[in-house]
Swiss-Prot record:
Organism: Xanthomonas campestris pv. campestris (strain ATCC 33913 / DSM 3586 / NCPPB 528 / LMG 568 / P 25)
Binding residue positions for FMN: S9, S15, A16, S17
EC number: 1.6.5.-, 1.7.1.17
Cofactor (UniProt): FMN
Gene: azoR
Pfam families: Flavodoxin_2
Catalytic activity field: 2 a quinone + NADH + H(+) = 2 a 1,4-benzosemiquinone + NAD(+); N,N-dimethyl-1,4-phenylenediamine + anthranilate + 2 NAD(+) = 2-(4-dimethylaminophenyl)diazenylbenzoate + 2 NADH + 2 H(+)
SUPFAM superfamilies noted in UniProt: Flavoproteins
First-level EC class: oxidoreductase
The protein's assembly and partners: Homodimer.
Keywords: Flavoprotein, FMN, NAD, Oxidoreductase
Protein name (database record): FMN-dependent NADH:quinone oxidoreductase
Amino acid sequence: MKLLHLDSSILGDYSASRQLTASIVAKLQAADPALQYTYRDLAANPIGHLSGAHLAAAQNPPATRTPELANDLALGVQVLQEFLDADTVVIGVALYNFTISTQLKAWIDRVLVAGKTFRYTAEGALEGLAGNKRVILAVARGGRYGEGSPTAALEHAETYMRAALGFVGLHQPEVVVAEGLALGPEARAAGMAAAQAQIDALPV
């Protein structure tokens, strides 16, 4: 079994989502020490954003590509293969200005690939090709954006990830949420404790 672990927070050791993904991964590894583990820190080692050069590369001979573009395209192939090969994917999702980090968006753009993770049928219907992976999202939010809160409509991180994963056929991600983390020390401690309880309840 292969485990892919992704962190995307820019906050380093202060990051709540990193603490949560580490706890989730530790639980999974304790249950199966033979797990093949791949880690990618999308903030420390960001993936380049797509550009017109990437689109043009598909239409032109490889010999016309600059070394920088060739290396970037090779990284994209590697990132996609890591996702395709994984049986379980654990993703740290920090909420920035109502949505995911730009670093995580760059990763999403490399794994939502027509013909690889989704396709359209002859009738025009969407078909996800990502298989039956287990996906666990560790969502960290400074405020309170949960269902029923006044700001719930502004939450576009968890909702975006659910949409992107559903697009490739992964419709049932497991979601751990820590929120209220920027509302003071007590609120942060309570939010992290609630998230850890969710992790403790995850099946292995």
